[in-house]
């Protein structure tokens, strides 16, 4: 019995956030013209997962006592880059995905190098680099438009078995591959401490 109470006390913040989410989603679907349908849930999942990816990236930085104001601009840059590179055949799309992920990694490495070796405050560095990343994104896509490989887009925004939003499965995969190992590693435990 004590184990259950301990777990409940330890997770009360997460459970409260989940409860608030359920209440807000219920209000959202009750006010939506289509009501609570599979399409409404799928659309909300697709939009929410994008925000969750950005939030996870920012959380890793904040846990290590930093701040990165360029995360949104890196997300924007990689989206614009994806609209140029993640097209064509399966192999071309795969190379495009690797290039886009590599670009995000490079942007983060640039931020880290400037903070560490340039000895600048993270907030100043990431505001400046965010402006640069935004400028590059505008050079790539001065006007809204572009697309990515339709098969990949359908696979990541569709429904599995006609019910489960694929974007939620992608989010779960990222959590299992990135977040869980980080939180259980020596580095992750040290960051939380």
Positions of PLM-derived features:
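Transmembrane alpha-helical segments of polytopic membrane transport and secretion proteins
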Residues: 1-19
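Transmembrane helix-bundle core of multi-pass membrane transporters
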Residues: 5-9, 122-185
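Hydrophobic alpha-helical transmembrane segments
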Residues: 14-19, 44, 52, 73-77, ...
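Structural signal for alpha-helical transmembrane segments and their membrane-water exit/capping regions
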Residues: 20-36, 64, 137-142, 178-188
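Residue-level recognition of pore/gate-forming positions within transmembrane alpha-helices
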Residues: 21, 25, 76-80, 104, ...
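Single transmembrane alpha-helix segments in multi-pass membrane proteins
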Residues: 25-29, 36-89, 114-120
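Residues that define the loop-to-transmembrane-helix transition and helix capping
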Residues: 70, 94-95, 121-124, 186-192
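Alpha-helical transmembrane segments within multi-pass membrane transporters and channels
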Residues: 90-130
